[in-house]
């Protein structure tokens, strides 16, 4: 498409890209860089400690950090700063679920909003108020199906920088669970599947709040096999190493997760994914080709059987699948189509 002037308005709580955990910020970082590389005039509104190939503007010199996440004051200040000169841009791309969306609806300029989260009652009420005045992008068809009445500019999968992920054909003798300790993320299911299959588990887990801590300490750890390796939150480099060496990644979620980046990250490393069919899983994992989608009803037996079959999965097929569907380039092309629709519509 012809070059457009794009304002990328990131959430204000973490740097872009983030220093650690922060899926939205990773996506924004890749998108801002990818659009710039494609010849678009991109301005990223984020915190001053962000790094980007786009032009960077900020109010807050440093990200306030995870403790401030969902704090509306930071969000409102950054949003109003980004919107102060609307004529400078052809399209605003908003990534925060709060004030950015509401402000974008009264800009008089095309506003695209990516639905990074789930549709809880508060978000549903907000989206209902502006559903005809902003363009929405879902990050999976499963997410879109939960609120089909919105004004969609399309479905665009979250992309990753595939060449940055180490591809490894030969694997070590462990399976990996990587994620938060929240019950819906499925750490306990991962433990049970590894036990049933008789394989060693490595669990790299972030404990984010008291409820997660309670679940982790009272439900998961007492069932953890003695030969398991239990890690806390890992660095980006450690994550990539763990993903590339694992025989498989377990993703046994128990909620309608709109998109799970760890699945694409694992497959980019040539590592198959074994997951339950919730949220975007059936769209992301090619069952029998890049991993196995196993039923909740027959868990953990079916997951254990799948773990014994991971040798049937070609690591090169996993990598090729991600390059085709979930690369940075595929994501940029998807958003270019969304912007074209928003600007022309």
Where are the language model's segments positioned?
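Catalytic cores of nucleotide-sugar-dependent glycosyltransferases that transfer UDP/GDP/TDP-activated
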Residues: 1-345
């Amino acid at each position: 498409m012809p070059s457009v002037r794009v304002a990328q308005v990131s959430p204000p709580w973490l740097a872009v890209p983030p220093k650690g955990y922060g899926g939205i910020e990773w996506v924004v970082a890749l998108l801002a860089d990818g659009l710039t590389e494609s010849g678009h005039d991109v301005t990223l509104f984020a915190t001053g400690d962000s790094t980007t190939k786009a032009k960077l503007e900020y109010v807050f010199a440093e990200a306030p950090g995870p403790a401030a996440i969902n704090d509306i004051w930071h969000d409102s200040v950054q949003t109003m700063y980004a919107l102060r000169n609307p004529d400078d841009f052809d399209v605003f791309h908003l990534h925060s679920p709060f004030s950015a969306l509401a402000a974008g609806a009264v800009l008089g300029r095309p506003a695209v909003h990516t639905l990074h989260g789930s549709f809880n009652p508060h978000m549903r009420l907000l989206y209902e108020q502006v559903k005809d005045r902003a363009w929405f992008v879902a990050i999976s068809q499963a997410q879109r199906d939960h609120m089909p009445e919105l004004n969609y500019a399309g479905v665009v999968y979250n992309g990753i920088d595939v060449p940055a992920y180490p591809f490894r054909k030969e694997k070590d003798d462990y399976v990996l669970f990587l994620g938060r300790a929240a019950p819906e993320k499925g750490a306990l299911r991962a433990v049970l599947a590894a036990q049933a299959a008789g394989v060693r588990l490595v669990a790299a887990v972030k404990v984010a709040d008291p409820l997660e801590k309670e679940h982790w300490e009272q439900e998961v750890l007492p069932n953890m096999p003695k030969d398991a390796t239990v890690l806390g939150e890992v660095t980006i480099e450690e994550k990539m190493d763990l993903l590339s060496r694992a025989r498989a990644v377990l993703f046994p979620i128990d909620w309608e997760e709109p998109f799970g980046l760890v699945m694409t990250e694992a497959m980019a490393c040539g590592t198959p994914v074994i997951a339950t069919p919730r949220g975007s899983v059936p769209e992301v994992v090619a069952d029998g080709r890049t991993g196995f989608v196993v039923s909740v009803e027959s868990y953990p037996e079916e997951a254990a059987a799948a773990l014994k079959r991971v040798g049937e999965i070609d690591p090169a097929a996993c990598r090729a699948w991600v390059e085709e569907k979930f690369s940075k380039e595929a994501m940029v092309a998807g958003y270019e189509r969304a912007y074209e629709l928003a600007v022309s519509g």
